[in-house]
């Protein structure tokens, strides 16, 4: 599958990273197109730019952010994603299309105690035929 991350998307990610003082996320060349793992830890971000979800070769995504409210709807573009970890106490919802992440093998959801629609989330998860491990710690 062709990667859809454009120069404009790279600039958006760079501006976002600069705004939050995240130097490790700087994107200067096309090496990011082959990025396999992305970890976003201990930041004060409230949203993640949709451009990150155009890195279609991503296989592992880990997000640990206290202030994150929601993930972009473009998350369903990560069709090669095998592992998804999220620990975001203030997240309010997951985007539509988690069932489109057909290669997911592991889902780890912890401390997402916001206004999650658990019924909707589970409805998408049960459609994931490759899922081998599911960890939910939701109050």
Question: Language-model features: where?
Answer:
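Generic detector of contiguous secondary-structure segments
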Residues: 1, 88-99
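LRR N-terminal entry segment and analogous cap-like coil->beta motifs
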Residues: 2-65
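Low-complexity intrinsically disordered segments
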Residues: 3, 9, 40, 53, ...
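The feature encodes a structural signal of leucine-rich repeats
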Residues: 25-26, 48-51, 71-74, 94-97, ...
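Leucine-rich repeat
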Residues: 32-33, 54-58, 65, 77-81, ...
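A short, hydrophobic secondary-structure junction motif
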Residues: 38-39, 48, 125-133
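Concave beta-strand-loop units of leucine-rich repeat
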Residues: 39-44, 62-68, 85-91, 108-120, ...
């Amino acid at each position: 599958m062709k990667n859809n991350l454009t120069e404009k998307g790279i600039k958006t990610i760079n501006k976002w990273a600069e705004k939050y003082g995240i130097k490790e996320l700087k994107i200067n060349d096309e090496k990011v197109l082959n990025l396999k793992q992305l970890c976003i830890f201990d930041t004060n971000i409230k949203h993640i730019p949709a451009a990150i979800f155009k890195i279609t070769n991503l296989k592992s995504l880990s997000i640990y952010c206290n202030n994150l409210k929601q993930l972009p709807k473009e998350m369903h573009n990560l069709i090669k994603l095998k592992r998804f970890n999220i620990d975001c106490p203030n997240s309010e919802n997951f985007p539509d299309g988690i069932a489109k992440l057909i290669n997911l093998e592991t889902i780890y959801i912890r401390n997402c105690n916001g206004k999650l629609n658990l019924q909707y989330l589970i409805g998408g998860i049960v459609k994931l035929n490759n899922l081998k491990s599911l960890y939910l710690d939701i109050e």
